[in-house]
Amino acid sequence: MTAVEQTADGIRLRIMLQPKASKDAIIGLHDEELKISITAPPVDGAANAHLIKYLSKAFKVPKSAVQLEKGELNRHKQVFIPAPKIIPEAVRQLLDNP
């Protein structure tokens, strides 16, 4: 599987998460994963909650729709976003150029 996979139902992302960063951002491709930095620390699920909030805003979907499929206790994660309203430019480029 590549870092970004578009399905009939939505988009699946393989993510390498960088917690405690200076800003929330989609950095780009890193070893076949989409590198995303977030400001939240990796403590008591705060990083996962912040990642879900960030992705819901970036893709314009409800927070409850973003599904953390793998990697709850790991920085390598797999997330499914059903029926995104928009696709951020960094993700669109990976879809257009696999």
From Swiss-Prot:
HAMAP family: UPF0235. It holds the Pfam family DUF167. This is UPF0235 protein Asuc_1977. Belongs to the UPF0235 family. SMART domains: DUF167 (SM01152). It comes from the Bacteria. It comes from Actinobacillus succinogenes (strain ATCC 55618 / DSM 22257 / CCUG 43843 / 130Z). Gene3D superfamilies: YggU-like (3.30.1200.10). InterPro entries: DUF167 (IPR003746), YggU-like_sf (IPR036591). GO terms for cellular component: cytoplasm.
